[in-house]
Amino acid sequence: MNVLVDSDILIEVFRGRDAAIVDAWRALPSPSHALLCSPVSICELWHGVRPAEQNALEALFAALICVPVNAEIGRRAGDYLKRYSKSHSVEIVDGLIAATAAVHGAALWTRNRKHYPMRDFDFYHQPDLR
C-alpha cells in the first residue's frame, strides 16, 4: 500500500512535536509501504522553513517519493472543487492532494480529515505504537 503523507503530518514529523506520529513515521517505510508526497506539500513546508533548517527539511523530502501533478490529477482536483468547494470549503491545495491520492491509489495520511470529504480514496489509519 502506498501512503500519501499530507502536509500536517510532514510538519509534525519535521518538528518532532507529536511522538505518536513520529513513531508511526519511523515504522512505516517498508517494501510494502511507499511514502509519497505532493509538490503542494513541499511548497507548504518550504514556505515556512527557516534557512538554518533547510538541509534537515531536504533530508525529510529525500525519504519521500514526490508525485508530480499531471493533467489527470488536475482534472480530478477540478471535479472535487466543483463538488465540494462550496459545501465543504475544499481549497485548491486540498483538492490537489486528494486527487493525487485517488489517482495513485494511495491512502492519505492526515489529521485534517474534514478537509477531505471525497470518498474515492482511503485514509491511512495510524497505528498506536505506544
Language-model-detected regions and their locations in the chain:
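Alpha-helix capping/helix-boundary segments
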Residues: I9-L10, S41, I73, L96-I97, ...
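Generic structural signal for small/hydrophobic residues in well-ordered secondary structure
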Residues: D6-S7, L45, A77, A101
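Active-site neighborhoods of divalent-metal-dependent phosphate/nucleic-acid chemistry enzymes
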Residues: I65-R111
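Residues that scaffold the ATP/ADP-binding catalytic core of kinase and kinase-like folds
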Residues: E12-V13, G48, A77, R119, ...
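Structured helix-beta-strand junction loops
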Residues: P31-S32, A63-L64, H104, R119
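Short, well-structured N-terminal submotif of metal-dependent ribonuclease cores
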Residues: M1-C37, W46-A62, R130
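General small-molecule cofactor/ligand-binding pocket signal
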Residues: L36, V67, Y124
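Acidic, PIN/NYN-like endoribonuclease modules and their adjacent C-terminal/linker elements
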Residues: M1-N2, A98-R130
